Amino acid sequence: FAQADLQPLATVKLNKSETITVKQLKTRASFIQKQYGMESLPIEQKQALLENLIAEKLITQAAAKEGLSVTDSQVDDAFLNTFSQQLGTRVSEAQLEDLIKKQTGKSLDEYIKEYSGMSKSEYKAYLKNQLIIQQYVFSKKQSEIQAVAATDEEIRNAYEMNKSTFVWNDMMKLFLVMVPKGSNDMAARALATDLRNKYKGDSKKSEEIKNSNENGTNYRAGDITVAKTAQQAQQLGWSIDKLNELFGKSAGYLSEVTETASDFQFYAVLKKYDAKMLSISDVVQPETTVTVYDYLKRNITSQKQSQYFTEAAQEISKSLDIPSNVERKKTGDALKKLLNWQ
């Protein structure tokens, strides 16, 4: 099998000679299977993936020929954004490594391999290529992509088709303070108590607490909107009973300092919002300016631009896919034989 993995499938030579092997295709296939929960891929889909890899190399080589590149820090940002979005908070690579180790007992590299089928370095190389492709295609089609936008009819039709999903649950605006336990539970409890006493003495001190240099290092403090849902309770590390108890409180209520598995925290109820169905002109979240109409316009525009971008990338790669730039080493039955792995 190791010998077969080294078999070359195609060579892209627009700017330099790069060979795509069976092993590289297997890695990409594994990535797709992990992303979509698939046990295996049919040969036709593997062939399509091979064509995608050829297209990617054509565009990245064309970009290199024109002097386009991305920095390691841009790649690292894209890498961390992938996980920060999942976690709901910005993390460094060291913090991510520590978090993964605590939650799964695995190293970051092991976790990424399980999650994507790629090693960390392979995953970063994949992200780097995607960033270069985005940059190159956008440089060629910027005005056309930016001109793509949702129409009023598309927005209103989308609202009518999804009207039942635009609702407010019962919600509250809270001032929430969380002090991580770290290695000293007593010190964390003492800090949480001090911050609560400061707020209790003068609720305007919340701005001082939020703007302190300690916020984000020794503790986390801020205003959040909490919905009366099981998912929200899980995100906060609260029981359903605690969340229901919260929604029984009135604006102005200040909780005691409570302990969770990872921190000490307290909250103050700032405002309450009743559940309701949203019209197309209502704001999506309390105390924001984005309406349902704005939200749909942005999402539909983004979807249309993404679709246009994909088509533009395919068009560009097709124009570059000529015999002098690509040599397909295996075709027909010979290719299918190499792709017949489970």
Model-derived features: positions:
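Short amphipathic alpha-helical surface patches that mediate protein-protein
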Residues: L80, E160, N211-E214
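Surface-exposed patches in mature extracellular/periplasmic domains of secreted proteins
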Residues: E39-I43, A62-Q74, W168, K204-N211, ...
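PPIase-associated folding chaperone regions across multiple families
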Residues: A4-L6, Q33-E44, K106-G201, Q235-Q342
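N-terminal targeting/tethering segments
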Residues: A2-A125, V283-V292, K304-Q307
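An exposure/low-complexity boundary signal
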Residues: D72-G88, K228, Q232, I322-Q342
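Secretory-pathway/luminal and periplasmic proteins that interact with or process carbohydrate-rich
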Residues: F83-E93, T165-N169, D185, G216-I224
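Ligand-binding pocket segment of bilobal, Venus flytrap-like solute-binding proteins
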Residues: N197-A233
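Short alpha-helical scaffold segments that flank and stabilize functional sites
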Residues: K65-E66, L191, L195, N215
